[in-house]
Amino acid sequence: MLDFLGDLQRTHMCGELRASDAGSTVVLMGWVNKRRDLGNLIFLDLRDRSGITQAVITADAGAEVHDRATAVRSEFVVAVIGRTKLREPNTVNKNIPTGEIEVVADELRILNDCKPLPFSPSDTVLANEEVRLKYRYIDLRRAELHRNIELRHQVAIAIRDHLNAQGFYEIETPFMTRSTPEGARDYLVPSRVYPGEFYALPQSPQLFKQILMISGFDKYFQIVRCFRDEDLRADRQPEFTQIDLEISFPRPETVFRVVEGFLKAAFSTIGVELQTPFPQMSYDQAIRLYGIDKPDLRLPAMADVRAAFARENLESLHVDPELPVLAIVIPRVGDLSRKERDELRLLYPARLAQQNIKVLDDTRRLEKSFPQTIPKVCELSGAGTEDYLVIVAAGTVSFGDGNEGQKPPTGGEVGGFYRSGSGAAGNVPSGLSRLSMRERQIFEGAGQVRLALAQKFAERHRLFERRGTGDDYKLLWVTDFPMFEWDETEQRWNAAHHPFTSPHEQDMDKLESDPGAVRALAYDVVLNGTELGSGSIRIHRQDIQAKIFKALGMSPEEQQARFGFFLEALQYGTPPHGGIALGLDRIVMILAGAESLREVIPFPKTAKAVDLMVDAPTPVSERQLKELGIAVVGKKDL
């Protein structure tokens, strides 16, 4: 019953035919999306990646062709040879580009059949995701996934073309390298030739791209696969793709302009014109205005409204008047009933209560108690009559979070040094400042409340409604991150970014005396509250790199064991350099409006890092293990 393709060649893709093609003889090939049998007339909706065309088999085609059409089922692979004609006006399908024409079949070849399907790719109600991942080759036939994968291709091409035009070389770096942990665990590859020794799959090409700058290539980029053996979390992939680049002799703004350029090219693939340059905000401003280092600018910033309250009023509310009193505004939500407020409180992080951080959400009650105060709060925060207003402040007794009294070597400030700048409603003082642990709890707690409220009301009040313009996408650069973070458990400093990030020149003298006061020349590009990419100006001097390793508690012996090859390379005329890496998967997910990374990756893993289609990972034979000198000592249940 099945036919060979022979020397038959298709003349058109299924989605290409238009009314102007009427009268042509065509050869179409693809999958049967739907079959409708009306007796003497059989309709086949023929599908390939370009779209769908309707083929009709009439009695004039002959008994053999009619019998073949009767045998065809959904997802059979067929070839149709016939003549195109205009549809009758009352049968035109305006929902598809080919809806004005149909192909009257003279010949039908069945190139392959199809078993009963576990689900249909044309179903409007999706099957369970595990089933779809197991049969990914069927799931990938869905039009939505086809559009996503095509978009991924177009975005990658746009980025490549832009960077090529800017003089960047696309250079491949090794996949099998040495283990130099950068935070997450490495995926290790055992060596058969050298028993007991291992390669590692790269978490990023970090050191190789820096070595390319030492080698004089000036501008490098790569759209590269990376691997991280992270703890299992929703919507994370153990292998992912990033847009990686490095530049010699840059300032941070040099990197910013390059990234803005290729993101503008990427967004143009969906018809969105981004406005550049992106605004900049220091880490300190982000924490003070948004309570997070990945601010979502689609929502109003928080505002410190202490000035609206008399001191005795705050004390009567058991609020500490010496600490920030933060107003959060959620647009267009209006006032809520007591029941609605009670339901909202269930969304707030439990640790707010543990830290004695108060959420004052009954503004009517506050206005009755302090009639002059709420109008001032609204003025300072920009809240309107249709907005929902919440105030977050510190209780007068701090219960802490189990870490009170534990301090880094340089004092009570956590997260290091911050540069303040101007902010909304005069919210951020000028000059240099530190945040105490208590202040940080308040800002971050308020930031969590702000996000919880936004997520709760997003759909109901169309907070994040997409309008198909650049205003849907609020991008910014966050700069001046702390160089180090204090680890309470280990009682030592860790690199906040990675240990190859350069400190600010003005802070070099604090590396040994006050590491918490050192700012990094690090920067993130953030879109609508999501980090798209992270980068920095790198250390190009061996003496400074050694100081950073020392500040991280790394002995000279450990430095040599882990990074000796790189420390050696730094001594051979290394130029100043810097770069960034952005997640391609996440960029495409945002552009596609997808809910999950798995919707824009052709062959993704589950949240448990399993490939259900090929059933990986799997045990290997004892012979393979013996060749590698490996013994399996036990399995951990996931």
Could you describe each region identified by the protein language model?
Residues 1-638:
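Class II aminoacyl-tRNA synthetase catalytic cores and aaRS-like
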